Amino acid sequence: MANIDLKAEKGQEQLNELLANKSYLQGYEPSQEDVAAFNQLNKAPSDKFPYLLRWYKHISSFSDAEKKGFPGIPTSASKEEDDDVDLFGSDEEDEEAEKIKAERMKAYSDKKSKKPAIVAKSSVILDIKPWDDETDMAEMEKLVRSVQMDGLVWGAAKLIPLAYGIKKLSIMCVVEDDKVSIDELQEKISEFEDFVQSVDIAAFNKV
């Protein structure tokens, strides 16, 4: 069949490429050319040739009687012209198929690139303990909020009683995981050593 051996993997690969954007070998309905190729294959091709496998399953769904009723392969005006017919498409058709494939891939890539990237964020509650009950908690909160990092947003805060009149500062923040290291944030807060005794993570949740 047009010098293509469909029992060889190379021939099956060529036919698979041809069927990438069409349902039948010729035109918009099955023909005797489909039957001839089907018979030459003799068995279902590997699933690494998805278009060929789809076509094979479709042709195999027809009965022998139905296959005999398929129209014959179009004949040329002369034997010479017939010999020149490439039953599996011309180079121009291959180029057109490649062009369509390239356009589809470009459209997919453009669509994917325009899709906004998902920014992974976490909601964190920090418990910050002072040294004693004489620590100015309002000033300590002010110092904590003065810590600025790209991807860090401070939220609500409240004072929670501990013991002996001592209160801890419980403060919430939202961080972008790729930009903010919680360990680094804790270290920066701990630098206010005149106010801060310890910094602990009370809660950590993905947003």
From Swiss-Prot:
The record's section on InterPro entries has: eEF-1beta-like_sf, EF-1_beta_acid_region_euk, EF1B_bsu/dsu, EF1B_bsu/dsu_GNE, Glutathione-S-Trfase_C_sf, Transl_elong_EF1B/ribsomal_bS6, Transl_elong_EF1B_B/D_CS
Q: Which SUPFAM superfamilies match?
A: eEF-1beta-like, GST C-terminal domain-like
* Organism annotation: Artemia salina
PROSITE patterns to which the protein is assigned, alphabetical: EF1BD_1, EF1BD_2
* Source species, domain of life: Eukaryota
Keywords per UniProt: Acetylation, Elongation factor, Phosphoprotein, Protein biosynthesis
Query: What protein am I looking at?
Result: Elongation factor 1-beta
Outline the subunit composition.
Answer: EF-1 is composed of 4 subunits: alpha, beta, delta, and gamma.
Biological function: EF-1-beta and EF-1-delta stimulate the exchange of GDP bound to EF-1-alpha to GTP.
Q: Which residues carry this modification: Phosphoserine?
A: 90
Q: How is it modified after translation?
A: Phosphorylation affects the GDP/GTP exchange rate.
Spell out the family assignment given in the record's similarity comment: Belongs to the EF-1-beta/EF-1-delta family.
List the residue ranges of the region (Disordered): 70-96
Report the leader peptide range: none
Compositional bias (Acidic residues) spans?
Answer: 80-96
**Positions of post-translational N-acetylalanine modification:** 2
Disulfide feature: none
Record-level Gene Ontology MF annotations: guanyl-nucleotide exchange factor activity; translation elongation factor activity
Give Gene Ontology CC terms: cytosol; eukaryotic translation elongation factor 1 complex
